[in-house]
């Protein structure tokens, strides 16, 4: 059973959400009294409670979603809350739906999105992975962080050819290395307030680190928001090359480290928005005519299931007219379909930009 102190915090949090009339999060929308009462006393095998799930959304009433999964089991234990939120966010994922098996597809059908180099500054494809047998951030101990870092860094040190590189632990990092990684926009900072309040930043910087290849086109973040964020990126719009590099890397890592996978939700992640393929294919792009009004840009993008963010990602503004545009759907479709959705949408948006007066 859940202890009284936690229950009191849960009741107070529920009341706060109910009274926050300007809160538009999916948490507030779907955490009804019935749902709340049905799961407030539950606990996972690793000790996670509903408070671990909702505390970030209770603290940050401006959250879009407002919940995180403290461990893999939470998706089932707190299903009455996760299920409707996942269905809502991913544009329809019913209780009977299942995420399809991994399918990278025919890489040769992908193209360079902007061969003339007029619009796209860079292209990036990333996916998140969790290591089997470990909980997610809020439930990890300092020892587990170290153990995971050891497993991952030794796996990455065996990367070959284009993927060969160096692992830089955040613990004890020299100022010079730190500055270089900041200049390259590679260094992740301790989490923002959404992650902080989800308890995703405990024992920082223990167990956290960054691996990148010599060409700086392949990158792995270790124990940031997810256990692993595997990233392929480069300047320009050559999506085919970027995607192919990611596929090679993920398959390579997966052959050595078992990932946390669920028959219904696909690959499991800390945030329910990333479930399934966990894949986010994005471009940094300038579309000055379409972007005269960000709202218009967002409306156009959403027609293609694309999402617009500021230059430096979520919760940021555009700098110099550069936007980050990516696929929104990650669940209920294959990796190939997700990357195709981004490709086809961006090609259409470039066409519209060229045609605009």
Swiss-Prot record:
Gene3D superfamilies: ATP:guanido phosphotransferase, N-terminal domain (1.10.135.10), Glutamine synthetase/guanido kinase, catalytic domain (3.30.590.10)
Catalytic activity, as annotated: L-arginine + ATP = N(omega)-phospho-L-arginine + ADP + H(+)
Binding site for substrate: 64-68, 225, 271, 314
Protein location: Cytoplasm
Domain of life where this protein originates: Eukaryota
Keyword Kinase: yes
Stated consequence of mutating residue 317 to A: Reduces catalytic activity by 20%
Outcome of substituting residue 225 to D/Q: Reduces catalytic activity by 99.7%
InterPro entries, alphabetized: ATP-guanido_PTrfase (IPR000749), ATP-guanido_PTrfase_AS (IPR022415), ATP-guanido_PTrfase_cat (IPR022414), ATP-guanido_PTrfase_N (IPR022413), ATP-guanido_PTrfase_N_sf (IPR036802), Gln_synth/guanido_kin_cat_dom (IPR014746)
Broad enzyme group: transferase
Sorted UniProt keywords: ATP-binding, Cytoplasm, Kinase, Nucleotide-binding, Transferase
Family designation: Belongs to the ATP:guanido phosphotransferase family.
Listed name of the protein: Arginine kinase
Source species of the chain: Limulus polyphemus
């Amino acid at each position: 059973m859940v202890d009284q102190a936690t229950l009191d915090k849960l009741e107070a949090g529920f009341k706060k959400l109910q009274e926050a009339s300007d809160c538009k999060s999916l948490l507030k929308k779907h955490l009804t009294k019935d749902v709340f009462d049905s799961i407030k006393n539950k606990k996972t095998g690793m000790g996670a409670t509903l408070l671990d799930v909702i505390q970030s959304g209770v603290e940050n009433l401006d959250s879009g979603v407002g919940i995180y999964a403290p461990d893999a089991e939470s998706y089932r234990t707190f299903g009455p809350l996760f299920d409707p939120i996942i269905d809502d966010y991913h544009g329809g994922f019913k209780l009977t739906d299942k995420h399809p098996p991994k399918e990278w597809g025919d890489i040769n059908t992908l193209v360079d999105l902007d061969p003339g180099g007029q619009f796209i500054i860079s292209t990036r494809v990333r996916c998140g992975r969790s290591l089997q047998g470990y909980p997610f951030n809020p439930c990890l101990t300092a020892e587990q962080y170290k153990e995971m870092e050891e497993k991952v860094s030794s796996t990455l040190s065996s990367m070959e050819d284009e993927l060969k590189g160096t692992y830089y632990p955040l613990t004890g990092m020299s100022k010079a290395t730190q500055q270089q990684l900041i200049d390259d926009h590679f260094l992740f900072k301790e989490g923002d307030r959404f992650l902080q309040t989800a308890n995703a930043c405990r024992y920082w910087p223990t167990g956290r680190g960054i691996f990148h290849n010599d060409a700086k086109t392949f990158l792995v973040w270790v124990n940031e928001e997810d256990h692993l964020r595997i990233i392929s990126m480069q300047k320009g719009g050559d999506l085919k090359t970027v995607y192919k590099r990611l596929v090679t890397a993920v398959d390579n890592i997966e052959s050595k480290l078992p990932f946390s996978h669920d028959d219904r939700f696909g690959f499991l992640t800390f945030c329910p928005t990333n479930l399934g393929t966990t894949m986010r294919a994005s471009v940094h792009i300038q579309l000055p005519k379409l972007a005269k009004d960000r709202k218009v840009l967002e409306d156009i993008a959403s027609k293609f299931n694309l999402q617009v963010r500021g230059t430096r990602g979520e919760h940021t503004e555009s700098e110099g007219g550069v936007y980050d545009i990516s696929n929104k759907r990650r669940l209920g479709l294959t990796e190939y379909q997700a990357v195709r959705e981004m490709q086809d949408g961006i090609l259409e948006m470039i066409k519209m930009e060229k045609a605009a007066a």
